[in-house]
């Protein structure tokens, strides 16, 4: 959530942010009104309580008619204090509810617009010219089937659409990717973590995934637990309700977890293969830093993502995501998109978001520096979303006979194997 003091001092900035997101600008005025009621009702409650306490002392010293009048006033005060308390609680609840609906403040350098209004910042690598090489590229599903690596038919039989099995070299390729990604993260100073896949509502809400993203989340009604769509959620909530020593920052975690997404708004999109699925594994980077260090940390996370994709020998570009395409918790977001030959376009493989103090305020995570305690900043970045990375590797490193060249960085994790060969029929 944002700082209420900032809202009071510069409401136009918050309105501009909401407008850039394509969200309800009127929410800002509703929140200002609720906050004013909360503050004024709090003042009234404090005044009545002070009078009530003072009256108790006077009653002890009074007698006769004076005491009777004071007792009458005390009875009225009891009613008034109760009403003021209820009014204060109601105004506070309304303020908190509206505050939870407000997105993070969009960074002023973020391009304004929707999904297609991003700005390309960098392009890396070159697209292969398959025509010059003399063959038509196969898509990742055809290649996966030739290699005995991907089985979507049995995935659908067992679990429904957008589920799959990774078999043989497909399973080995996932394990190689995960181990290589964790090795890179560990070398960069991240602490590896295996995180829970089920979290409580306060963890999901605290990271900003129960607002605009709620329809994409799986919920277990009987247990009131949520399946995470990313280990960002448990990694952010790891220090919930804690005060961290400033000398410990930055804290960097690399979480590995299964991820679950309903893909409710994706009907008809990417129905072939494993690019968009309901369950997948992912290595996620997460950082806790001082607020003034968040932009520099954001660049570091992006550099680590670029280093990873470069090590996989993939052509990719970096985009500055437009304002209306940001998640509610992100002030700024960069995506790295790999070139997918059979689609003839770049597709998202990684993303990194600077969430500033938004999540830490919601999760009550603070930092202590001497006698000063304040919210800190949180950031996240995908290192390896496994299925999409497999898609990019298969398509970009395929050879005419249906085999796939293994990027050098993965070979130590595949027993030195240099090529994935089609299985014998």
UniProtKB/Swiss-Prot annotation:
Gene Ontology CC terms, in alphabetical order: cytoplasm
Subcellular location: Cytoplasm
PROSITE patterns on file: AA_TRNA_LIGASE_II (PS50862)
Chain residues that bind ATP: 261-263, 277, 348-351
Positions of disulphide bridges: none
Keywords, alphabetical: Aminoacyl-tRNA synthetase, ATP-binding, Cytoplasm, Ligase, Nucleotide-binding, Protein biosynthesis
Molecular-function annotations in GO: ATP binding; serine-tRNA ligase activity; tRNA binding
Documented EC number(s): 6.1.1.11
Positions in coiled-coil regions: none
Reactions catalysed, as given in the entry: tRNA(Ser) + L-serine + ATP = L-seryl-tRNA(Ser) + AMP + diphosphate + H(+); tRNA(Sec) + L-serine + ATP = L-seryl-tRNA(Sec) + AMP + diphosphate + H(+)
InterPro entries xref list: aa-tRNA-synt_IIb, aa-tRNA-synth_II, aa-tRNA-synth_II/BPL/LPL, Ser-tRNA-ligase_type_1, Ser-tRNA-synth_1_N, SerRS_1_N_sf, SerRS_core, tRNA-bd_arm
Binding site for L-serine: 230-232, 284, 382
GO BP term, pick one: seryl-tRNA aminoacylation
Transmembrane feature ranges: none
Xref: Gene3D superfamilies: Bira Bifunctional Protein, Domain 2 (3.30.930.10), Serine-tRNA synthetase, tRNA binding domain (1.10.287.40)
Pathway linked to the protein: Aminoacyl-tRNA biosynthesis; selenocysteinyl-tRNA(Sec) biosynthesis; L-seryl-tRNA(Sec) from L-serine and tRNA(Sec): step 1/1
Oligomer and partners: Homodimer. The tRNA molecule binds across the dimer.
PANTHER family from the UniProt entry: SERYL-TRNA SYNTHETASE (PTHR11778)
Domain comment as written in the entry: Consists of two distinct domains, a catalytic core and a N-terminal extension that is involved in tRNA binding.
Protein family (similarity comment): Belongs to the class-II aminoacyl-tRNA synthetase family. Type-1 seryl-tRNA synthetase subfamily.
Name of protein: Serine--tRNA ligase
Native source organism of the sequence: Streptomyces coelicolor (strain ATCC BAA-471 / A3(2) / M145)
Native organism taxonomy: Bacteria, Bacillati, Actinomycetota, Actinomycetes, Kitasatosporales
């Amino acid at each position: 959530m944002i700082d209420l003091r900032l809202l009071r001092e510069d409401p136009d900035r918050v309105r501009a942010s909401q407008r850039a997101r394509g969200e309800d600008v009127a929410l800002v005025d509703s929140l200002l009104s609720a906050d004013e009621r909360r503050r004024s009702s709090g003042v009234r409650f404090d005044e009545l309580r002070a009078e009530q306490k003072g009256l108790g002392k006077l009653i002890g010293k009074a007698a006769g008619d004076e005491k009777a009048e004071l007792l009458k006033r005390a009875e009225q005060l009891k009613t008034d204090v109760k009403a003021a308390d209820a009014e204060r609680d109601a105004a506070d609840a309304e303020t908190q509810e509206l505050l939870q609906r407000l997105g993070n403040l969009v960074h002023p350098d973020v391009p304004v617009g929707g999904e297609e209004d991003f700005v390309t910042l960098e392009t890396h690598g070159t697209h292969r010219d398959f025509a010059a090489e003399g063959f038509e590229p196969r898509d990742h599903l055809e290649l996966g089937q030739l290699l005995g690596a991907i089985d979507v038919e049995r995935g659908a039989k067992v679990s429904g659409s957008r589920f799959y099995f990774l078999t043989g070299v497909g399973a080995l390729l996932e394990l190689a990717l995960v181990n290589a990604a964790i090795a890179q993260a560990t070398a960069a100073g991240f602490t590896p973590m295996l995180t829970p896949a089920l979290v409580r509502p306060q963890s999901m809400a605290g990271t900003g995934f129960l607002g605009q993203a709620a329809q994409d989340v799986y919920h277990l009604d009987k247990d009131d637990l949520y399946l995470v769509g990313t280990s960002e959620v448990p990694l952010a909530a790891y220090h919930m309700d804690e005060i961290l020593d400033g000398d410990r920052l930055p804290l960097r975690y690399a979480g590995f977890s299964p991820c679950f997404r309903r893909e409710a708004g994706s009907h008809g999109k990417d129905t072939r293969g494993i690019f968009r699925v309901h369950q997948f594994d992912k290595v996620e980077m997460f950082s806790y830093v001082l607020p003034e260090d968040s932009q520099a940390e954001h660049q570091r996370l992006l550099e680590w993502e670029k280093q990873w994709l470069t090590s996989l020998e993939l052509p990719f570009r970096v985009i500055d995501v437009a304002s209306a395409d940001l998640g509610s918790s992100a002030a700024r977001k960069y995506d790295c998109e790999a070139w997918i030959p059979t689609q003839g376009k770049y597709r998202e493989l990684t993303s990194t978001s600077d969430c500033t103090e938004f999540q830490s305020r919601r999760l009550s995570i603070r930092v202590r520096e001497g006698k000063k305690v304040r919210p800190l900043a949180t950031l996240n970045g995908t290192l390896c979303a496994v299925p999409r990375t497999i898609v990019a590797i298969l398509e970009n490193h395929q050879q005419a006979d249906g085999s796939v060249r293994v990027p050098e960085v993965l070979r130590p994790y595949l027993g030195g194997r240099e090529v994935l060969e089609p299985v014998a029929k």
